[in-house]
C-alpha cells in the first residue's frame, strides 16, 4: 500500500511547524520582525531545506524591498542557530542546511484580489450609469 505523502513531505511539514515556533519564540533579531513560514522544500536526501517566509510588516506597509532583503539576510545569518534548535526539536539523523527565501505569493495574491475588486466596482458603476441613462 502506497503512502499518501513521501517522507520528505512529512519532514518538510514538521520543519515548517518547528521553524515557525523557533522564529516566534527564540529568534530575537529586530530585523526579522513578524516572519511567517509559508513553506519548506526539502531535498530528497534531507541534506538541504529551502524555507519560504513572508513578513507581516511588508503586508501592512508599501512593498519595501529593503525590509525583505534585511529580513532574509538576518534569517540566513541566524540559520545555524535555527538549525541547532531544529535539531533539538526534531529527531533526525542529519538536520538539513537551511536557506531562507522570500515568498511573495501572499503579496501578489492580495494585489490580484485588489485588482479584481476594483474591476468589479468599476463594472458596477458603469452598469449603474448606463441604467440611469436608459431611464431618462
UniProtKB/Swiss-Prot annotation:
InterPro entries: KH_dom-like_a/b, RbfA, RbfA_dom_sf, Ribosome-bd_factorA_CS. Keywords: Cytoplasm, Ribosome biogenesis. Its main location: cytoplasm. One of its GO terms (cellular component) is cytosol. GO terms for biological process: maturation of SSU-rRNA. It is found in: Cytoplasm. GO terms for molecular function: ribosomal small subunit binding. Pfam families: RBFA. It comes from the Bacteria. Monomer. Binds 30S ribosomal subunits, but not 50S ribosomal subunits or 70S ribosomes. Belongs to the RbfA family. One of several proteins that assist in the late maturation steps of the functional core of the 30S ribosomal subunit. Associates with free 30S ribosomal subunits (but not with 30S subunits that are part of 70S ribosomes or polysomes). Required for efficient processing of 16S rRNA. May interact with the 5'-terminal helix region of 16S rRNA. HAMAP family: RbfA (MF_00003). This is Ribosome-binding factor A. It comes from Photorhabdus laumondii subsp. laumondii (strain DSM 15139 / CIP 105565 / TT01) (Photorhabdus luminescens subsp. laumondii).
Amino acid at each position: 500500500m502506497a503512502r499518501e505523502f513521501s517522507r520528505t513531505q512529512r519532514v518538510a511539514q514538521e520543519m515548517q511547524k518547528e521553524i515557525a515556533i523557533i522564529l516566534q519564540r527564540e529568534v530575537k533579531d529586530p530585523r526579522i520582525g513578524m516572519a511567517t513560514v509559508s513553506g519548506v522544500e526539502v531535498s530528497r536526501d534531507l541534506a538541504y531545506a529551502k524555507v519560504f517566509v513572508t513578513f507581516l510588516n511588508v503586508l501592512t506597509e508599501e512593498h519595501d524591498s529593503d525590509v525583505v532583503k534585511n529580513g532574509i539576510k538576518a534569517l540566513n545569518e541566524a540559520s545555524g542557530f535555527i538549525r541547532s534548535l531544529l535539531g533539538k526539536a526534531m529527531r533526525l539523523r542529519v538536520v538539513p542546511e537551511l536557506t531562507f527565501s522570500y515568498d511573495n505569493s501572499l503579496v501578489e495574491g492580495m494585489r490580484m484580489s485588489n485588482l479584481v475588486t476594483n474591476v468589479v466596482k468599476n463594472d458596477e458603476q458603469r452598469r449603474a450609469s448606463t441604467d440611469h441613462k436608459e431611464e431618462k
